[in-house]
Amino acid sequence: MCGQCGIILGKKRRTREELEALGNMFTELLKYNERRGRDATGIFVADQSGIGKILKAPVSAICLTESIEYQNAIQEIGNRAVALSGHT
């Protein structure tokens, strides 16, 4: 089995606090989906140009969300981001 989650942000200017809250919400969704798949986890952060950042690893969602790479990816979410997608 596997789990999928996502947040569609659309084009809107958000405050740093709003972006942080969205990042936290996405992290919780990803961890919640861990029960559907524990062997690997990946995320994709899409921006307005269609280019995005992919992060994946052969670890559980909880392990990935605790990594420096994940924390950096979530902190980099800015006003150009239009969607967050996760897979466990």
Predicted segments with their positions:
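N-terminal glutamine amidotransferase
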Residues: M1-T88
